[in-house]
Amino acid sequence: HLRRGPNAFGNKTVHKDNYSFTFLHSRLSLIDLNQRSDQPMEDDEGVICFNGEIYNFLELKKNCEEKGVKFKTSSDTEVLLKILNLYGPDGLKKLDGDWALAYYNKRLDKIILSKDRFSIRPLFYYDTGNEFYFASTITHIMKLMGSKSKLNFKRVANYISFGFKGTNLDPNAFFSGFNKFPTASYLEFNRGKKKAYKKYWSNIPQINSSLNYKQSVDLVKDKLIQSIKLRLRTDKNIGCSISAGIDSSIIAGIVKKILKKDIEFYSYAPHSKDYDESDLINLNIENLKAFNTHKYVTLPGGNPLKTLTDIVLDAGLPLNSPSDWLFHAICKSMKEDECTAFFTGSAGDDLFSGNYIDHLNYLVSIYKDKKKFEKAYANWDKKIKRLIRSPYLKDFNGYLRNIKNDPLASW
């Protein structure tokens, strides 16, 4: 099986005069393992169905209790339900977490769909005009619809042209008619009628130029520690991937040495010596004094093409990165060890502008502002371009043509 869960299932159907809807949920229990926290969860005011985790749920729970709200569980799901009961869509701004959610307000007869600030949790939809389907995977929607869809060849061409780094170029999915729910947004249905998508958060950088280098480093360190501390809130065993990379090494160090948590560590052991990082990994493990809780994982034997096919079919999209295959092997090992919650070092490139396609997307976004573009392009041409190995990502004009027209036009 490809997933760590599920360990519980639930459904809720509501029939109204002019429409009806059904929430379906399969649960991987992490917080409050009791069946009282299964989903969809319902109280007198609303119904919630969500995939994800609300990391600041204890702080939000205290806020609700101060307003007289009573709780029956110790789960983040119930806290999310109460927050949306109290604040509606404005409550999304209060959440620190990652989620794909569907919420129904009984009094207002309103449904809200939403996705987290960075699209960590997947959410796809298919809108026929009369029916609206949504799920964490495209394959689930196809099963609900009882039909299959044709490939979106323009999307496939983008993937072939730019690789996994081009998978976020547009909101369209790899199958025709399917779309990815927009990031940091929500959608309302009032009495069954769909309204426009709205943003609840925008990533507008606030630059503090007064900070020196040490202050900047200390600030990042403090933010990392606080973030990881919140994410340790779980009632299940915790694992952590560790490689020679700086991101996973930092996370492992904070968890083990600063927060003093005993967790299981997992590393990938490649068959090829060209990709062997074991010397640096072992130094990390020695420094953490974690040899007794560290495990090397290899890719499973058998038919690798079948494994790859299963992963792609389950997700409904190609791999974002070759490391997804390795991550699958580690997750399988974790499941065998009954280790459910997991820290992984990823997105460091995104945070510190290491993804070259992000530079190109920025240049495209300011292309019409001649003065701003010329300055940014000169900087990219001088400092960034020489570091790029892919010929496609070194050719800005070709990239621009693909974005503005059709990726097949340059073939």
Q: What is each model feature region?
A:
Residues 15, 25, 128, 286-293, ...:
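Glycine-rich active-site loop/lid subdomains used to bind and stabilize high-energy intermediates
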Residues 1-315, 327:
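Cysteine-centered catalytic environments shared across enzyme families
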